[in-house]
């Protein structure tokens, strides 16, 4: 368990856990299914998330009346994706931890269009995290692919983890779950 923190640093472990309730039995089958990011250019974003990070496009849904499309990605085998549209939709929405990319049509051609990544004022959303077997090997590959870094593994005080940016400037933490305990 972490060392007790001074009052000015936030909640102590004890206080944090005392603020939490045991899950209601009715939530037993709930799951965190998706995180959504708005994107400017689906061609750039789909290339980044599939080629650079290795995610698989599970499904694309278009909403012509509202002029937007949704792209659902996850770490899944593309051969497991059902062919039937209804079955595919139910399957997609039952996966754990999917990334939903929302594209509002026309933003890719608007030079003034950009999205706030939450890491500058006013702060809000921070990042998503990707677990990898070897942070240094992954980052070497990212460098070779020309990926923009916010933090390389040996920068700063927290050694062994990195932050990269996607085409819209969203931050992505690159971590190794087996080594994270030695970092924090």
Swiss-Prot record:
Q: How is it modified after translation?
A: Glutathionylation at Cys-139 inhibits enzyme activity. Phosphorylated at Thr-107 in the presence of CaMK2. However, this is a consensus site for phosphorylation by CK2 so phosphorylation may be mediated by CK2 rather than CaMK2. Phosphorylation is induced by TNF and suppresses the TNF-induced transcriptional activity of NF-kappa-B.
Question: Which co-factor is required?
Answer: Zn(2+)
Query: What's its EC?
Result: 4.4.1.5
Which top class of enzyme applies to this chain?
Answer: lyase
Q: How is its activity regulated?
A: Subject to competitive inhibition by methyl-gerfelin.
Domain of life, per UniProt, equals Eukaryota
Please list the residues that bind substrate: 34, 38, 104, 123, 127, 157-158
**Active site per the UniProt annotation:** 173
- In Gene Ontology terms, what is one molecular function of this protein? lactoylglutathione lyase activity
The answer on whether this UniProt entry bears the keyword Transmembrane reads no
Give the UniProt record's GO annotations in the biological process aspect.
Answer: methylglyoxal catabolic process to D-lactate via S-lactoyl-glutathione; negative regulation of apoptotic process; osteoclast differentiation; regulation of transcription by RNA polymerase II
Q: Which residues carry this modification: S-glutathionyl cysteine?
A: 139
Identify the InterPro entries for this entry.
Glyas_Bleomycin-R_OHBP_Dase, Glyas_Fos-R_dOase_dom, Glyoxalase_1, Glyoxalase_1_CS, VOC
The reactions it catalyses are: (R)-S-lactoylglutathione = methylglyoxal + glutathione
* PTM annotation (N-acetylalanine): residues: 2
Modified residue annotations for N6-acetyllysine? 148
> List-wise, which residues carry N6-succinyllysine?
88, 148
Q: How is the cofactor bound?
A: Binds 1 zinc ion per subunit. In the homodimer, two zinc ions are bound between subunits.
- Sorted alphabetically, which Pfam families does this protein's record hold? Glyoxalase
Q: What is this protein called?
A: Lactoylglutathione lyase
The encoding gene is Glo1
